[in-house]
Amino acid sequence: MSNLAATTADDQLRKLIPPQAECFPDGVQQGEIKVLFTGEAETRVALESAARLAGRLNSRVSLLVLQAVPRPLEPDRCPVSIEFLRGRMLELAASVDAEVEVQICLCRDKVEVLLRAFGIPSLVVMGGRKSWWPGRKTRLGQALERLGHKVIYIER
């Protein structure tokens, strides 16, 4: 990771959760930081930030991967090999200095799965690129915020 990316991510974390903080923000599930897969490079930066934060807050990190299955296919017939996807995600998780649990969810509607996967308000870290136009990733984050989750956006 470049120093610029690390500084940007660290600065963003400091704004949201001060360095002296030793506990989770009020109203969110304690003990777990959830990272939503938003692309390989973006998620790597988010995982690195979540790992640093997890070290401070004595918590674990979970990586949630939402894999869409198109309508013509049966829900359990993923167009991507699950073994391949799991291998890539485990590789990505192993690249950070923290134990990361990987969860892969096959779905038709990502927002619907987020409703079920994040039942209790959670601390969620999402990686992305800075953009003036809200994209799919931003809309997913906004949907989580509407449900009461605390979302931290980490720019790549």
Q: Regions from the language model: what does each represent?
A:
Residues 2-16, 22-23, 52, 63-87:
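Acidic, proline/glycine-rich short linear motifs
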Residues 34, 60-64, 101, 123, ...:
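A structural signal for isolated positions on well-ordered beta-strands in alpha/beta enzyme cores
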Residues 53-55, 68, 105-106, 133, ...:
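A composition-biased, non-transmembrane "mature-region" signal
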Residues 1-27, 95-124, 130-131, 140-151:
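Structural beta-alpha unit
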Residues 36-40, 105, 126-131, 156:
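Structural motif
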Residues 23-76, 146-147:
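Small/aliphatic-rich secondary-structure junction motif
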Residues 78-92, 135-145:
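Short, aromatic/basic amphipathic alpha-helical patches
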Residues 54-57, 88-98:
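Short helix-loop-beta junction
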